[in-house]
Regions:
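Gly/Pro/Ser/Thr-rich low-complexity, intrinsically disordered segments predominantly at protein N-termini
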Residues: 1-178
Length: 178
């Protein structure tokens, strides 16, 4: 699709087929490739963990990879999984898309993502104050990026702790070994 500066929500929804995923980035539609079975399995396990966290902490809401969030740049991003404070939804009603960035974005590195695409996504998240969690399935490594702190790395034998999430601890060894 040609580069455009604006796109209506309806045009965005009609940009691809139902089975496809895409984002609006820098004035153009970027289609996302299918993922490996390993990626899909890891994603399902991660969603289960975050769902359990949200059931225990009702002030948080988890979203899967089809939820669309609006960045201050105007880009529409779809993290693999995301967490949002429930208080950010006025009156508790959830809109079709969020006119804000998530509080926490979980991303699984995909071999088809170019370094430039990853950097642009990281920049969008950084500029919007999003806590970023990047999983590298091959290296069994996690990068935790706070908007205001140095990058932190977690190896599979360490629990992932995100201090902005109360009582959150993710057993990486269990997650990577499943």
């Amino acid at each position: 699709m040609a580069t455009r500066t604006t796109l209506t929500w309806e045009e965005f929804l009609a940009a691809g087929e139902e089975w496809q995923r895409w984002e609006w980035v820098d004035g153009r539609i970027e289609f996302m490739s299918s993922v490996s079975l390993q990626h899909g399995h890891f994603l399902a396990l991660l969603i289960g963990c975050l769902g359990s966290f949200c059931r225990a902490h009702s002030e948080w809401v988890a979203f899967g990879s089809n939820a669309v969030f609006t960045m201050s740049s105007g880009n529409w991003r779809m993290p693999d999984v995301s967490l949002v404070r429930r208080a950010r939804f006025p009156g508790g009603a959830m809109p079709t898309k969020a006119d804000f960035a998530p509080d926490v974005a979980f991303e699984i590195h995909s071999p088809s993502d170019s370094p430039g695409q990853i950097q642009r996504k990281r920049k969008d998240y950084q500029q919007n104050g999003v806590v970023q969690v990047w999983f590298d399935l091959e290296k069994r490594l996690v990068e935790l990026v706070y908007p205001d702190r140095p990058l932190q790395y977690f190896e599979e034998y360490q629990p992932l702790v995100i201090d902005t999430l109360p009582d959150f601890s993710l057993d990486l060894k269990e997650l990577y070994s499943a």
